[in-house]
């Protein structure tokens, strides 16, 4: 079964939590330790990547270390065409739709496509939208930031992504953002699309995660909170416990 199908099946019964690990922030061994504690806490998938350009060697080392120490599927979350590892299970083949730079919309994707065709990893088409404040990814990706409360612009991009055939949409406030994308925007967009919505950035406590999930996020991503914590298991267990407690009434 493909990872995308696993996600869709799981979403019929529960929300999904993914832990994002940035190889630029931690050594491969440290990344593996975070992933192991995240697995024990109940995370569903590990994402590896970030907005800082990282070479293939470091990506390989990090993904391999995580695979050796956990039973979780690893999904690449690349910031450029260099951030690919043959050891991963899948890649979010993503387009930063609100970038002002063609490279982040389709350029890096074109550069990586031939190499990816040689690898046995799953490619998951995903639309990536960066909201204010954007943080590093907004700057590096030259994003025309969407205001967190501008639900009409968010909806226009999201519907365009759905009509173009993307399988997932990711709302990003930026790693380390002081707050996540507005719950009103999430709820409004989710009510009008029929593909899964991922939300990340600014989610660092159980209460915030719960609000974002209840607003309509199908998948919650946390990254910085795990990187900075001395007790990854405890921090993530509280967050994951909250979102997993939500009763699913309508399947995606």
Curated annotation (Swiss-Prot):
It is found in: Cytoplasm. GO terms for cellular component: cytoplasm. Mg(2+) binds at residues 22, 51. GO terms for molecular function: magnesium ion binding; phosphoglycerol geranylgeranyltransferase activity. Pfam families: PcrB. It catalyses: sn-glycerol 1-phosphate + (2E,6E,10E)-geranylgeranyl diphosphate = sn-3-O-(geranylgeranyl)glycerol 1-phosphate + diphosphate. Belongs to the GGGP/HepGP synthase family. Group II subfamily. Prenyltransferase that catalyzes the transfer of the geranylgeranyl moiety of geranylgeranyl diphosphate (GGPP) to the C3 hydroxyl of sn-glycerol-1-phosphate (G1P). This reaction is the first ether-bond-formation step in the biosynthesis of archaeal membrane lipids. Keywords: Cytoplasm, Lipid biosynthesis, Lipid metabolism, Magnesium, Metal-binding, Phospholipid biosynthesis, Phospholipid metabolism, Transferase. Sn-glycerol 1-phosphate binds at residues 170-176, 201-202, 223-224. It is an enzyme of class 2 (transferase). GO terms for biological process: glycerophospholipid biosynthetic process. This is Geranylgeranylglyceryl phosphate synthase. It comes from the Archaea. InterPro entries: GGGP/HepGP_synthase_I (IPR039074), GGGP/HepGP_synthase_sf (IPR038597), GGGP_HepGP_synthase (IPR008205), GGGP_synth (IPR010946). Gene3D superfamilies: FMN-linked oxidoreductases (3.20.20.390). Its EC number is 2.5.1.41. Pathway: Membrane lipid metabolism; glycerophospholipid metabolism. Its cofactor is Mg(2+).
């Amino acid at each position: 079964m493909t990872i995308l199908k696993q996600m869709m099946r799981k979403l019929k019964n529960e929300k999904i939590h993914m832990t994002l690990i940035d190889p630029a922030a931690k050594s491969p061994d440290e990344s593996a330790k975070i992933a192991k504690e995240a697995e024990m806490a109940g995370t569903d998938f590990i994402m590896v990547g970030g907005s800082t350009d990282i070479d293939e060697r470091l990506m390989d080392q990090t993904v391999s270390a995580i695979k050796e120490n956990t039973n979780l599927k690893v999904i690449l979350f690349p910031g450029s065409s260099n951030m690919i590892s043959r050891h991963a299970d899948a890649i979010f083949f993503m387009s930063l739709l609100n970038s002002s730079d063609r490279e982040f919309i389709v350029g890096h994707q074109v550069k990586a496509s031939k190499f990816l065709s040689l690898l046995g990893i799953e490619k998951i088409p995903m639309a990536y939208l960066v909201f204010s404040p954007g943080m590093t990814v907004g700057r590096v990706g030259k994003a025309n930031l969407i205001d967190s409360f501008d639900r009409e612009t968010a909806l226009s991009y999201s519907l365009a992504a759905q009509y173009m055939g993307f399988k997932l949409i990711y709302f990003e406030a930026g790693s380390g953002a002081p707050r996540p994308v507005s719950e009103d925007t999430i709820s409004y967009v989710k009510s009008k699309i029929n593909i899964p919505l991922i939300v990340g950035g600014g989610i660092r406590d159980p209460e915030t995660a719960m609000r974002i999930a209840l607003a309509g996020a199908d998948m919650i991503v946390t990254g910085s909170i795990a990187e900075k914590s001395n007790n990854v298991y405890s921090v993530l267990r509280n967050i994951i416990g909250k979102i997993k407690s939500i009763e699913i009434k309508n399947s995606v």
